[in-house]
């Protein structure tokens, strides 16, 4: 499991390396265009089994920490789903990877 470290280390979220790689691509593209957005995910049962959201903006430090050094194969369809969701009013929701078609 990798980690998304938000802010100055105030929040660390464990995320599977494959999910994290896709998230990093979409987040980087959005922030390069100066587009802040909300990111929401479902919490693990160990932290309450609820939902969490953070505001992503280029002024807020963000660190993607991977458990392995292997680059996973990128699913372009998943990138599209994440990108579209990041552009809507409620922001990006981490969703399951769609089956490649």
Which residues does each PLM region occupy?
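Helix N-cap / beta->alpha transition motif
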Residues: 16, 53-57, 75
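Mixed-charge, glycine-accented linear interaction segment located at domain edges/termini
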Residues: 68-101
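Short, structured protein-protein interaction patches enriched in aromatics and acidic/basic residues
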Residues: 35-67
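Short, intrinsically disordered, mixed-charge
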Residues: 25-33
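Short, surface-exposed beta-strand-loop junctions and turns on beta-sheet-rich folds
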Residues: 21-22, 46, 70
